[in-house]
Curated annotation (Swiss-Prot):
This is B3 domain-containing protein At5g38500. Its main location: nucleus. PANTHER family: B3 DOMAIN PLANT PROTEIN-RELATED, TF-B3 DOMAIN-CONTAINING PROTEIN. It comes from Arabidopsis thaliana (Mouse-ear cress). GO terms for cellular component: nucleus. Residues 25-89, 192-237 are annotated as: Disordered. Residues 26-56 have a biased composition (Basic and acidic residues). The lineage of its organism: Eukaryota, Viridiplantae, Streptophyta, Embryophyta, Tracheophyta. It is found in: Nucleus. Residues 309-411 bind DNA.
Length: 411
């Protein structure tokens, strides 16, 4: 009996040992399978992030320079590249599909990037770029200051010859305002730059006589206009929107583009004019004085656009040039004056690659105004959104991977 009990206990112990070993083996296999799945999911996430970044960089406007176009010309003189920008919405979402269909896709991007690095230019100003030294900012300030002082001295000599006072010529100088001395333009300076400064040497009579003369001349003009039937119509500006809250679709577009986590900023609202939708001009004019806020640019972007504007001023001050040379220089200058590359998105999440830069307008009176402009593919934006004169638009700014982006709101 004792031997039978011992045998039975040994069998039970052996069975329990086998069951425990099987359970441990099953648990070990399960842990190995989970580790493999985790490693696969991590690799997939990294590859998806890389593909997403490559797709976003492909949306950035890449306008080839004239020198690159000449190098890529065929022996018979026909250029192999197109100067027009590609439609951003026709780019495949799957980056691997684009690479398979066009094997030279990656090589072309790398070649374009290397050429821009050699030229010392960049289509996009990134936030991670190193800030310039204080010495370069001082040199830029002194350069702009000498320009304005030189212009004021020329104006002073001209007015002195005509019998005007020398002090008034400098005080009434409003060509390009003092906001250009620095990289940032302030709202206060824009408000004060439109005011005409008084002439201290002006000998006038009593204030009451000035008011009386102005009132009488105004009344005479009104009576003459009534008699002739020519009455000027008063231009009434359209009422702005009652609410300036960020539209919901702007946040949706930021999520769709995987934009940086920041609050979008409303910088500009206006009713479109005929010049804004003119296909020959192909630009949206954004006057400095109409900006709602001006803190949406980085110091690097301000410095890059200011350097492009200085080049434009130097080109204008050069003497007479032959017509053929002027045309060639205009084409080269259009390629070199990059400004800041931007992306504009509308309410349907359709995107365009544009250029954002400073543009100065000179008037017949000798004074000038400074503006921002959006150009390059602006005609496509007008067609894609059916914009026309009289439409109201608003521009919201945000950043995606450090790139300046605009959201176009219409109402």
């Amino acid at each position: 009996m004792d031997s039978g009990k011992d045998m039975w206990s040994r069998l039970c112990l052996l069975a329990e040992t086998v069951v425990m070993a099987a359970e441990e083996e099953e648990q070990r296999r399960r842990l190995l399978a989970e580790k493999r799945e985790d490693s696969k999911s991590q690799k997939k996430t990294v590859s998806e992030e890389d593909d997403s970044e490559k797709r976003f960089l492909s949306h950035v406007p890449r306008k080839k320079r004239s020198s690159l176009v000449k190098r890529q010309q065929k022996p018979n003189g026909v250029s192999t590249s197109s100067s027009s920008l590609p439609d951003l919405n026709q780019i495949p979402i799957d980056y691997e599909t684009e690479t398979k269909q066009n094997p030279s896709f990656i090589e072309r991007l790398v070649c374009d990037e290397e050429q821009r690095v050699k030229k010392g230019k960049s289509r996009i100003i990134w936030e991670e770029e190193e800030e310039a030294d204080e010495d370069s900012e001082k040199r830029l300030f002194e350069k702009n200051l000498m320009k304005f002082v030189g212009h004021s001295q020329q104006q002073q000599k001209f007015e002195t010859l005509n019998g005007a006072s020398s002090s008034s010529s400098f005080l009434n100088l409003r060509c390009y305002e003092a906001s250009l001395f620095l990289d940032y333009n302030t709202v206060e300076s824009e408000k004060t730059e439109t005011k005409v400064l008084p002439n201290p040497n002006y000998q006038s009579s009593s204030p009451s006589s000035c008011l009386t003369e102005n009132d009488t001349s105004r009344k005479r003009r009104a009576v003459e206009q009534r008699k002739s039937g020519k009455v000027k119509k008063v231009k009434v500006s359209p009422l702005p929107r009652l609410s300036t809250e960020t539209p919901e679709w702007v946040f949706q577009a930021m999520g769709h583009m995987n934009a940086d986590a920041e609050t979008p900023k409303l910088i500009f609202e206006r009713t479109l004019f005929k010049s804004d939708v003119n296909s020959n001009l192909s630009r949206l004019l954004i006057p400095f004085q109409k900006l709602i806020r001006n803190d949406f640019l980085t110091p690097e972007e301000c410095r890059a656009m200011q350097e492009d504007k200085d080049k434009d001023d130097e080109d204008i001050s050069v003497g007479t040039i032959l017509v053929c040379q002027a045309k060639q220089e205009d084409e080269d200058k259009d390629d070199e004056d990059i400004g800041a590359g931007t992306i504009l998105v509308n309410q349907r999440f359709k995107m365009w690659g544009l250029r954002f830069k400073i543009w100065g307008m000179e008037k017949d009176s000798g004074h000038g105004t400074l503006n921002y402009i959006l150009n390059w593919d602006w005609n496509d934006v007008v067609k894609g959104n059916s914009l026309k004169a009289g439409d109201n638009i608003g521009l919201w700014t945000f950043r995606c991977r450090g790139v300046l982006c605009f959201a176009l709101d219409t109402w």
